[in-house]
Amino acid sequence: MSKVCVLTGKRPKYGNNVSHANNHTRTRFEPNLHTKRIWIEEEKCWVKVKLSAKAMKIISKTGTAKLAALLK
């Protein structure tokens, strides 16, 4: 499965680890993703999605309506 958040669209970014000696090593920065089961009240069913930590915070504040609209 891809490492992309369903709600926010966050995906891996590429950059450099820089040492004290200023050596650059290419690296991949992964988003903070979690696989969650979320109850969608409108459809009366559980949905399994990959969400970032920020997306979980958005859902807890605004509810699952935004997520249900994206999954249709």
UniProtKB/Swiss-Prot annotation:
Gene Ontology cellular-component terms for this entry are: ribonucleoprotein complex; ribosome
Q: Name one Pfam family in it.
A: Ribosomal_L28
Instruction: Establish whether keyword Ribonucleoprotein is in the entry.
Output: yes
The GO annotation for biological process reads:
translation
* Disulfide linkage: none
Provide this UniProt record's keywords sorted from A to Z: Ribonucleoprotein, Ribosomal protein
GO terms assigned for molecular function: structural constituent of ribosome
Protein family membership = Belongs to the bacterial ribosomal protein bL28 family.
**Protein name from the UniProt record:** Large ribosomal subunit protein bL28
Which gene does this sequence derive from? Answer: rpmB
